[in-house]
């Protein structure tokens, strides 16, 4: 089983790291090409492209300028500890055991606009480049065209390395669009999380994002390898809804408190 999650806009480069083990990202030659494109943008152009404030745009212009592929702990940290958002609140990587991190390194991947596909212990310098950004580049008009099948091919390599034929999609639609489903050499399962509000069950963004992280943690801590095993997920009040699920989409509900 290989699980995919999205990255986060919010980053944490301050909290003390629980391990000094690390790996280097595997698609850095591609990242360097994107950095070259981004370095040509002014702060104002970044602000317009990313729909962010001048302050955030200036910060990221500086990050693009300072980026260099010689990553160490003076300028980078492991991806699983660097991202800080709703998904990562659910994942709570800082409290995973060593054996869990070892399992995650083989079975969890983070999609990234800049780095393509990250393993948990891959070092990364801070950045902001969302997958949906319409950044014109040497390969096309956006990041989906830039990455083309590169991410998909890497996923297939990672599936083969762990002898798995199951991909669990816990990523957002924006990021999952970077994966070419037709070329994935595995069964694909997507967990969906619905919360009850005013007597109706629906996807509530904040809760759904956190639930994806909780599911990733559930997979890691229990070292799951079969789609059937996912149905036992019952963290924080969620339960499997067999009636509304299919082989490709597993629905989990949580009743209003």
Curated annotation (Swiss-Prot):
PANTHER family: PEROXIDE STRESS RESISTANCE PROTEIN YAAA, PEROXIDE STRESS RESPONSE PROTEIN YAAA
NCBIfam families, A to Z: PRK02101.1-1 (NF002541), PRK02101.1-3 (NF002542)
GO cellular component, one term: cytosol
HAMAP family listed in its UniProt record: UPF0246 (MF_00652)
Phylogenetic lineage: Bacteria, Pseudomonadati, Pseudomonadota, Gammaproteobacteria, Moraxellales
Cysteine pairings via disulfide bonds: none
Pfam families: H2O2_YaaD
An annotated GO BP: response to hydroperoxide
Family in the record: Belongs to the UPF0246 family.
Organism encoding this protein: Acinetobacter baumannii (strain ATCC 17978 / DSM 105126 / CIP 53.77 / LMG 1025 / NCDC KC755 / 5377)
Name of protein: UPF0246 protein A1S_2267
